[in-house]
Amino acid sequence: MMSDEKNLGVSQKLVSPSRSTSSCSSKQGSRQDSWEVVEGLRGEMNYTQEPPVQKGFLLKKRKWPLKGWHKRFFYLDKGILKYAKSQTDIEREKLHGCIDVGLSVMSVKKSSKCIDLDTEEHIYHLKVKSEEVFDEWVSKLRHHRMYRQNEIAMFPHEVNHFFSGSTITDSSSGVFDSISSRKRSSISKQNLFQTGSNVSFSCGGETRVPLWLQSSEDMEKCSKDLAHCHAYLVEMSQLLQSMDVLHRTYSAPAINAIQGGSFESPKKEKRSHRRWRSRAIGKDAKGTLQVPKPFSGPVRLHSSNPNLSTLDFGEEKNYSDGSETSSEFSKMQEDLCHIAHKVYFTLRSAFNIMSAEREKLKQLMEQDASSSPSAQVIGLKNALSSALAQNTDLKERLRRIHAESLLLDSPAVAKSGDNLAEENSRDENRALVHQLSNESRLSITDSLSEFFDAQEVLLSPSSSENEISDDDSYVSDISDNLSLDNLSNDLDNERQTLGPVLDSGREAKSRRRTCLPAPCPSSSNISLWNILRNNIGKDLSKVAMPVELNEPLNTLQRLCEELEYSELLDKAAQIPSPLERMVYVAAFAISAYASSYYRAGSKPFNPVLGETYECIREDKGFQFFSEQVSHHPPISACHAESRNFVFWQDVRWKNKFWGKSMEIVPIGTTHVTLPVFGDHFEWNKVTSCIHNILSGQRWIEHYGEIVIKNLHDDSCYCKVNFIKAKYWSTNAHEIEGTVFDRSGKAVHRLFGKWHESIYCGGGSSSACVWRANPMPKGYEQYYSFTQFALELNEMDPSSKSLLPPTDTRFRPDQRFLEEGNLEEAEIQKQRIEQLQRERRRVLEENHVEHQPRFFRKSDDDSWVSNGTYLELRKDLGFSKLDHPVLW
């Protein structure tokens, strides 16, 4: 066993020349401080020796949201790692978890004696106190992982075998079934990454078939196996003919000798072979091989080959028992058994290859079938067309009503506006009924129709009544509901911006672009594994990435995207009840994550130190500006003002790569004040995680808890829980929130999905508080930007002279990427990064600390506006300042 461990270590060093080269050029201590990805089974490697069982206590990091480490007993057998509180619980099958190390990405960090197992669904963090125990566990895990991967490669249809008897939970079997079905080919994919193969990460239908056809070496191997099998069968036929000659040559008296003397031993041998057969193949494997001519009859021979069960090799009693004849006949028996073994293993290998290829073809056919248009899709398209037509008609009616209202004198308009505000307040107070019955709280996916039937409040400027009939309170058709929501949002915007500001906002909105100058490039030729494999557990904000992985937006502009639904704060500023104001503030905090649902495939540009960005939106009524106030650590600060609210925050992100997923942990606090009520709200941000970084369809999820407090009024607070996705449940991206009063009693319930809509209440009487805007046409070709994101980097010629030269829109690499010039964008990106490194070196050599121009640090170490940006913009003061050269 020790020799096998040495050979395994040598093979792992040989299969990774790039890693060994880099480690040779670095010091041993620095290599121990970094994470090392453990290599898996590669190429034609065959690891069939069963490793011994390993067990003992290890420290395991507690699952989120719990913190710290707890002691658990781990049991490793044949590549399956089980853990429980004690060894007794393991024996009783009272497991806390079960990990297939063959399907996991394993990384180790020797300096801290940590072992990470990334199963894509969960990341298991293990720690060992003793260095000897750490080395022992790492060695055993390597061997078990290689053994398990070899087993999966040989028997891909038996991945679920080791989980069939597990009693973790009732739903565990379903979890492992889904894991195995999705990961059946993960070993081969991992081998491709480790050998440096240029694998495409695109998930489009045009690349699935070529990737499948590239693995034609499996079919070639299958053809060779069948050819060898044919040769073995011919050789077996010749041996059987020779044995038949011996049978006819010798006389009958020898038969009795064989029957009386040497027949007991083969019976025992037959029983032992049966035990071997059941152990190797299983009780369900009963495949037979019909051998063609020249077999003349049902000659039976003792053989342990299960695939030759139809050949009757047991009639040895017809042969002579002479010493010379017996030895010759025994040699023929051994040769025949040996060849039969070869035939069996060759056919089994060919069968496994054919099964894997059949599974690939079946998956492709299912994907193609699911992508074809169905009657349901056609019906939804028709419903959408009718909804758009109805929406156009309702908007036309609204314009006529608004035109009539403008003909009135100004006092009447003011009076109408007051009536609208009062009416809106009464209706919204009625809509947000305290629906706190847990029995009526339904699952989003199970009762989606009820949520679309939720009550929607629609107010017309010409309406003077508060009563709404029951027939008008509920909308049963999906398209009608969407139309009414859009119309209600349009009406709210118009009511908030009556007068000249409305006209200028409409003109500005009509001038804004609806698509980017060029579509996004393909990043399928970039090997993310080569970039990220040496950065396991590191902060990726310090790792240089190719420009193709970026989107033509900056982190400072991403902060502005959080104000896409600022009308929620405008609504909150009009509601006298602090409890209901908290509902809209919570909806605004949740809406900041909506655009990220479609944007898991790219990352924003990192701002350089001193870079700024401004966004003046007359149509939404706010003025926004931001600045990169620190580079290490990277901190971005922003500030926005409106007549109804003030918004500011400073955020820094820590990105960590865990093998198959990447965690984004934000650090900072968001603040919103409503001057009309004197409210000051603050809340934290939740953790984000991007899955399937290296292969498959990337997707993002947010999990954690947001706590919203009013620092100037303790009458209420809110908790919003972003629920972590579970693989045995279809309810992903859900949120649940509760507004509590001063005594801790729940007053309002919030639920929904953070990328779709938020509801308040319970059951069919729930009121829709917020719904995401529809995505623009062809958004997949333009980085999956929302309409608001498409407008962020647009350069307005009229305001170009008002911007400081440090504004993001002047940044050349980002502009070249937006225009589709990748080569020039990469050149400019490297030049800007080098320029920033030189600036930082000069500042450090002269012991000069960078001072942000438009933000200052407050007493609580947060960054707030110093009030100079908007004043300088009014007086064209940016041209009088000395600005650093950023690009």
Swiss-Prot record:
Tissue specificity field: Expressed in a subset of small lymphocytes (at protein level). Expressed at high concentration in kidney, lymph node and thymus. Expressed at moderate concentration in stomach, jejunum, ileum, appendix, spleen, leukocytes, trachea, lung and thyroid gland. Expressed at low concentration in whole brain, esophagus, duodenum, ileocecum, colon, skeletal muscle, bone marrow, placenta and mammary gland. Isoform 1a, isoform 1b, isoform 1c and isoform 1d are highly expressed in brain, bone marrow, colon, kidney, lung, skeletal muscle, spleen, thymus and thyroid. Not expressed in heart and liver.
Record region (Disordered): 1-35, 261-326
InterPro entries xrefs: OSBP_sf (IPR037239), Oxysterol-bd (IPR000648), Oxysterol-bd_CS (IPR018494), PH-like_dom_sf (IPR011993), PH_8 (IPR041680), PH_domain (IPR001849)
Pfam families linked to this entry: Oxysterol_BP, PH_8
CDD domains xrefs: PH_ORP3_ORP6_ORP7 (cd13287)
Consequence the record notes for mutating K60I: Abolishes plasma membrane targeting and nuclear localization
Membrane is among the record's keywords: yes
Motif (FFAT 1): 161-167
Ranges for domain PH: 51-146
Function: Phosphoinositide-binding protein which associates with both cell and endoplasmic reticulum (ER) membranes. Can bind to the ER membrane protein VAPA and recruit VAPA to plasma membrane sites, thus linking these intracellular compartments. The ORP3-VAPA complex stimulates RRAS signaling which in turn attenuates integrin beta-1 (ITGB1) activation at the cell surface. With VAPA, may regulate ER morphology. Has a role in regulation of the actin cytoskeleton, cell polarity and cell adhesion. Binds to phosphoinositides with preference for PI(3,4)P2 and PI(3,4,5)P3.
Quaternary structure and partners: Homodimer. Interacts with RRAS. Interacts (phosphorylated form) with VAPA. Interacts with OSBPL6.
Protein name: Oxysterol-binding protein-related protein 3
